[in-house]
């Protein structure tokens, strides 16, 4: 669970920004400003248009509509990987499903499937619409993954199928439109929104993942638990702890003892890789364990239901 740092910057930690790129329309060219520019919040309609454009321009990106929202908007998910992997997506999806269900698999068969498959990596953003960075980082990350040609990005795209899902289109449309309606930039705020930024649940849409009462939750759950079964899922938020930049695994002790230890240590491995990279690049601000209030208990949110 990230805090005040987009996953685009996690990728940016991996490679310099001054790299040759394929010719793709940049966010600045499309929106008129960089993602994250002060006093600018594109709405979901504009984000959707931009994602369509990137999918048209890039053979690394396929745009899928995973369902409709409670207000009838298309909820989109970008599938990002190498062109060669796109030609074999059905096979990699099947491998991921077989490994997740583990029906009739012994250790040798599972190891063989793991060698043949690709990592399925889920990134969602925008679940809590007033945590505006979540939806914005999806767009920045999509552009970087579709345009970079450095060796590390190419390797990532060869090894990984990245699923980038917008978690709350209705909320983004409402919050961005409300914010941008004020002509005086210094008076723009998300603090006076007149209604819920998810039609029925508002901020509590992150308490729905074990019930699937909301259309948006059902759309994402179908991708997570029926279609793709990703091995890693990154559920982006933008909130405390105060004084930090990002919270990551390992989570607070004690770990949930109902889970297989390998699941917990797998989370810890991902967090250790993040922490190690930030340390090497002299980028402070990552916190974990008792430094944050996030744990592996209460398994009803988008992140924790996946456990």
How should each PLM-predicted stretch be described?
Residues 6-18:
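Bacterial N-terminal signal peptides
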Residues 1-2:
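N-terminal secretory signal peptides that target proteins for export/translocation
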Residues 21-307:
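Structured catalytic-domain cores with a bias toward divalent-metal coordination
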């Amino acid at each position: 669970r990230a805090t005040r740092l987009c996953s685009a910057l996690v990728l940016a930690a991996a490679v310099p920004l001054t790299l040759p790129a394929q010719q793709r329309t940049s966010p600045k060219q499309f929106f008129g400003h960089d993602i994250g520019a002060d006093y600018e919040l594109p709405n979901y309609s504009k984000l959707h248009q931009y994602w369509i454009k990137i999918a048209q321009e890039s053979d690394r990106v396929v745009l899928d509509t995973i369902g409709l929202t409670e207000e009838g908007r298309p909820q989109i998910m970008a599938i990002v990987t190498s062109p060669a992997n796109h030609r074999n997506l059905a096979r990699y999806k099947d491998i991921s499903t077989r490994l997740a269900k583990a029906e009739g698999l012994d250790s040798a068969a599972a190891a063989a499937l793991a060698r043949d498959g690709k990592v399925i990596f889920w990134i969602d953003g925008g679940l809590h619409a007033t945590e505006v960075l979540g939806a914005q980082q999806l767009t920045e990350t999509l552009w970087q993954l579709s345009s970079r040609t450095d060796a590390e990005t190419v390797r990532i795209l060869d090894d990984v199928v990245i699923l980038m899902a917008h978690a709350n289109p209705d909320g983004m449309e409402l919050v961005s439109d409300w914010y941008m309606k004020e002509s005086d930039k210094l008076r723009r705020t998300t603090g006076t929104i007149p209604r819920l930024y998810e039609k029925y649940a508002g901020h509590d849409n992150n308490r729905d993942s074990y019930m699937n009462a909301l259309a948006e939750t059902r759309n994402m759950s179908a991708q997570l638990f029926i279609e793709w079964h990703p091995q890693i899922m990154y559920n982006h938020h933008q909130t405390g702890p105060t004084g930090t930049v990002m919270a990551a695994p390992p989570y607070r002790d004690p770990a949930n003892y109902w889970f297989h230890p390998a699941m917990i240590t797998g989370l810890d491995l991902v967090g250790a890789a993040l922490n190690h990279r930030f340390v090497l690049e002299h980028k402070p601000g990552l916190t974990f364990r008792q430094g944050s209030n996030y744990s592996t208990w209460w398994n009803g949110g988008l992140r924790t239901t996946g456990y």
